[in-house]
From Swiss-Prot:
It comes from Mus musculus (Mouse). One of its GO terms (cellular component) is nucleus. The gene is Fezf2. Keywords: Developmental protein, Differentiation, DNA-binding, Metal-binding, Neurogenesis, Nucleus, Repeat, Repressor, Transcription, Transcription regulation, Zinc, Zinc-finger. This is Fez family zinc finger protein 2. InterPro entries: Znf_C2H2_sf, Znf_C2H2_type.
Length: 455
């Protein structure tokens, strides 16, 4: 009895679709020995179903009764990641289309093309088991789409690189995860372990050529972390998938249109270089927007204050100043601002956060613009000079406000003492130091009049 039990474990049961007479006689002999045996033996994990139930199951979405009772182990990618059809296939749909093309809709032994025969490891150039026998065209393969695999989370006998592998089961009830994770059902190329000798002769384990992709990814990632739900892969693994997709397309003679991030179907890069500074842009529109930096043109002018801007988007943001709408309010001091970015910069004052530090004197600043203006004081260069008094300034806007001192234009007037100032900043500073600690109290009419005179 012991010899019969060992013989039964070493030789797998015959394929229900093979229909060969030697396999039928062997199965009958095994059945007689099992009946005569008194020892209890485990039930077969898969039994062929009647032809009536077989026809009903062919219409269902989940294909349970295939040639192999073992689940088809396919290395998939993390959940929610879309890949081209050459890299990853929906093998359940593939088997449905293959059986229809071969004429094998029922579970009988005759009729239709033979499925899988006695092949243990599929070595066809297509990477899909029995595609050459079935004669499937590449158009029958499903297009690339998001596939939701079942993820194995147990760590029974798996190495550290096992967390990279996601498997899709055609029949997850046939074998529990504990048996699948035992190691005897996995190929050596997939888990970097020595496979049993009986694996090579197993006629019902279809190892696909895409297992090379998982093995290659394991070399790139020796100790990967678990991928969360619908999260993008890291850049090295994306590169592995991209290279594998290109190799598969070359073998099949099909033009690859990669949908991976960073992939481009256009082989000619579009580079537009600025002739003045040499800066490169990917579109002609961006180069056109950049050119006013060198020409000094400000075609977009504000109708209220007359200030010019290089871009229309900057003018739109500037117009919010004149509407006096300040929806963004500080929770600590109650000060309101026109834009949320200005509020975020203001919050740094309360937190004492000064990320921009001068490398010459160590002084910190809340804003990057103030930091750049301060650095000009260390250079000693004042290229903007007044034509009347020859006073020099670091920036052009300081020269613009200085010119108001020569034409007696002081558009910003204090509502308390009536003193005029060239800049609104000077008015706020005057009120904060002399009159109160709240802020400027200039009337709106005075501000509007000041901006009208300035324009």
């Amino acid at each position: 009895m012991a010899s019969s039990a060992s013989l039964e474990t070493m030789v797998p049961p015959a394929c229900p679709r093979a229909g060969a007479s030697p396999a039928t006689s062997k199965t009958l002999a095994f059945s007689i020995e099992r009946i005569m045996a008194k020892t209890s033996e485990p039930r077969a994990p898969f039994e062929p179903r009647p032809a009536a139930l077989e026809a009903d199951s062919s219409q269902s979405k989940k294909l349970l009764n295939l040639c192999s009772p073992l689940p088809c182990m396919i290395p998939l990618q993390p959940l929610g990641y879309e890949v081209p059809s050459k890299t990853l296939l929906s093998y359940s749909e593939f088997w449905k289309s293959s059986l229809r093309a071969g004429g094998g809709g029922g579970g009988g032994s005759g009729g239709g093309a033979p499925v899988c025969g006695a092949s243990g490891l599929c070595k066809t150039n297509c990477g899909v088991c029995c595609k050459a026998e079935l004669g499937l065209a590449p158009s029958a393969l499903p297009a690339g789409r998001v596939i939701k695999p079942q993820v194995i989370n147990q760590a029974v006998g798996l190495p550290a690189s096992g967390s990279l592998y996601y498997f899709n089961y055609l029949d997850s009830t046939a074998y529990p995860p504990s048996e699948l994770l035992g190691g005897h059902l996995f190929p050596s190329g997939l888990l970097n372990a020595q496979a049993p000798t009986s694996l090579a002769a197993h006629p019902k384990l279809f190892l696909l050529e895409n297992a090379k992709l998982a093995s290659l990814a394991a070399d790139k990632f020796p100790h990967p972390a678990s991928y969360p739900h619908k999260e993008r892969l890291h850049a090295p693994l994306e590169q592995v998938l991209k290279e594998n997709s290109a190799l598969t397309a070359e073998r099949g003679g099909v033009k690859s249109h990669s949908k991976l991030p960073g992939g481009s179907t256009d082989s000619k890069p579009k580079n537009f270089t600025c002739e003045v500074c040499g800066k490169v842009f990917n579109a002609h529109y961006n180069l056109t927007r950049h050119m006013p930096v060198h020409t000094g043109a400000r075609p977009f002018v504000c109708k209220v204050c007359g200030k010019g801007f290089r871009q229309a988007s900057t003018l739109c943001r500037h117009k919010i100043i004149h509407t006096q709408e300040k929806p963004h309010k500080c929770n600590q001091c109650g000060k309101a601002f026109n834009r949320s970015s200005t509020l975020n910069t203001h919050i740094r004052i309360h937190a004492g956060y000064k990320p921009f530090v001068c490398e010459f004197c160590g002084k910190g600043f809340h804003q990057k613009g103030n930091y750049k203006n301060h650095k000009l004081t260390h250079s000693g260069e004042k290229q903007y000079k007044c034509t009347i008094c020859n006073k020099a300034f670091h920036q052009v806007y300081n020269l613009t406000f200085h010119m108001h001192t020569h034409n007696d234009k002081k558009p910003f007037t204090c509502a308390t003492c009536g003193k005029g100032f060239c800049r609104n900043f000077d008015l706020k500073k005057h009120v904060r130091k002399l009159h109160d600690s709240v802020g400027p109290t200039a009337t709106p009419s005075a501000k509007d009049l000041a901006r009208t005179v300035q324009s």
